[in-house]
Amino acid sequence: MAIGAVKSDLEPTNNEYLYNRWDVIISLSGFSNEATHIIFSKSKHQSIYSVPNQNKGIVATVVGGKRNILKLKNTDEIINIEPIIERKSVINSASVTDLSTTLKEGNELFTYVEIEANHEAPISFEHFLKIIEDGTFYVDYESESFIGNDKLRGLEKDSEVIEKRKRGAVTLRNQGAGVGRVYIYREDRVGVPSHNIIGYVSRGIQLLDTVKEHEKITIKTVPEKISTVALTQKDADIYLENLGIEHERDGLVDDDAIIVAQDPLYTVDIDKQKKLKTLGVPRDDFVEIELYADENPSSVWYFRKISGLLNGDVGHLRVNMAIKEMNIIMFKAVNKEAKGLIPEKLPDNKVNAWEICVSNTACKHVGNIGIRFEDNSEFGPTGESFSATNVIGKVVAGFDNLKAFKEGDTVYVKER
């Protein structure tokens, strides 16, 4: 099969050569460079194609799409040709973190990766936005085919869009081992039911090829995250106006009410609809906390997951017990999630006032959460011994608010 003709500056020869099936050959028909063709060899054969005097005129070999070539007819047209850049073509690029590195003539500088959302996968894209909330993607694992991040590994999401995982595709594992993990693909892979397509790299794919395990890359997204949660109603007015989004207040509509929910919830849907309803609550319902994730990875994960902080900006907990005489407030365990809460950061001879504690597997009632309003050197706020008490964080604002809550009340929490 021949494609052409175009004019070239090549010189023809009159030698006969043996060609294999799927060789791609440059031919100068009629021994003239005025009629230069590309020939696809469909079978092994011997012929004179007046090829240039180099490698029998063979410039490539077909490795994919052979069936498409066999289907082509004389009346078909090829309207566009684009290169597919493989990782091996850029793997030797220089990856530097030293900002004093001198650039030379001809150097190209790539500083971030831009990812465009798949608008049919709003939940998966929001999951990704939570992973990169500090603007970076940390590489927990890398292979020839992809890089991966484990920040929200274990957080289950429903199946959304299943497509071929092309080079530059960003996916979320929705089931099986590694559920909640996010991947960015360096090479093409087939689509599988366990991977939702979050979006695609639109700029900076060169960084994807050079980044190594335990390094970070800066990420920008289209659209950027849209969230009013934890803002006041007044601040949300200003924020949304700048984005060209219509704002409707709900719940407590006062200017200083704190937003704890928004509808639509997901960035992709808000960007599409250009309108947003926000639910406000009194500032008195709010508590700010600091969590010790490095010292209590399992317990902090548990707390964030059951409160909603794992994939949201504001979490909430329902008060199970509020014992004013003992200066204690407690929140009930979620048994399904509490399995495996091993002892981590234990109290040092006493539990300090306002420390957030979770009961661990050294006791029967695993996963209960408690806070004392005053120091205690005997028991944790869940009533357990110190050996069964993990200190996972502390309250940093809203102390009086917390004291006022009663059994059945909802406490809204935000990390500082």
List the model feature ranges, each with a label.
Residues 1-416:
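Cyclophilin-like peptidyl-prolyl cis-trans isomerases
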